[in-house]
Amino acid sequence: MPLMTGEQYIESLRRLKTRVYMFGEQVENWVDHPIIRPSINSVAMTYDLAQDPEYADLMTAKSSLTGKTINRFTHLHHSTDDLIRKVKMQRLLGQKTGACFQRCVGMDAFNAVFSTTYELDEAKGTKYHENFVKFLEMIQDEDLVVDGAMTDPKGDRGKAPHAQPDKDLFLRIVERRPDGIVVRGAKAHQTGAVNSHWHLIMPTIAMREADADYAVSFACPSDAEGLFMVYGRQSCDTRKLEDPCSVDVGNSRFGGQEALVVFDDVFIPNGYVFMAGEYEFAGMMVERFAGYHRQSYGGCKVGVGDVVIGAAALAAEYNGAEKASHIKDKLIEMTHLNETLFCCGIACSAEGHPTKAGNYQI
């Protein structure tokens, strides 16, 4: 299947039966809702830039699984050059949208789950890695968006998952069947969850044997039976309900979004399960994901920073203050911090190394 365009991506969302709630009510046409649509436009930009020859070198890659050309957001990094291109791609998209484009978490999850399941299978004789490779091949071939989900509501931070008064404050396995598992709980603050075709779930902390039911990783579609999303609020988000030409809207075309993703006894077939009780490997998956995601901030936040710095400089010029020393000092400091963050992203990429599975870790 060829790479999708931004418009094709938006149309693909309309075919989903995702259950989205906002302000206490279900949103039927969430794709065109004025509060949600700017975040969809941000994701669409990841598709449109992949179609542009000027940016194809950053936005696309050759799949190590199939040999086909794929969107880099579905790619497994196989060199330090891949890691560097990832950071540069993220800076580009931050510059183009001035917002969160929501696909970084899924990309980072792909690489963390790929290497962790390989070592898990090596130690336990399971077939999770095979399951994951088949899943990722499907995602690459159909050019889909995947929400990487790690953060649980947690409850009392001083207690382990199994010791919580409410056992569902961490996502867990509540039933094991011959053909799969049933999960219950939630993932909180999930970037781009509503705008995703699938969700890739990971544990949120290192765990011990008593927490085995919480050591779970799997994939499920956004409109799976029993899956509900409560849309997260953004600062000043209701301004988008006003005149779209209003100067008070701010970034009227693009935006970010998060959601509370609730799993109300969702069935996950065995083929989409990548960890189910192997608590010894929960910490490895969390640590590897965290490394990739810190690297991501060296790109995406820097791109948005470029926009913010440019806007601040323009505001100073409009007000005739561009030559004021204290204004220049602030702009210089902002630029210094922004470029330092970018340097950190590039440096940790250049120092990357291969995992046992073959993909590269920072």
Predicted ranges, named:
Residues 296-354:
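Extended amphipathic alpha-helical segments enriched in small hydrophobics
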Residues 358-362:
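Long, low-complexity C-terminal extensions of enzymes
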Residues 5-15, 274-277, 299-311:
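Acidic, low-complexity proline/glycine-rich segments
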Residues 148, 153-300:
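FAD-binding core of flavoproteins
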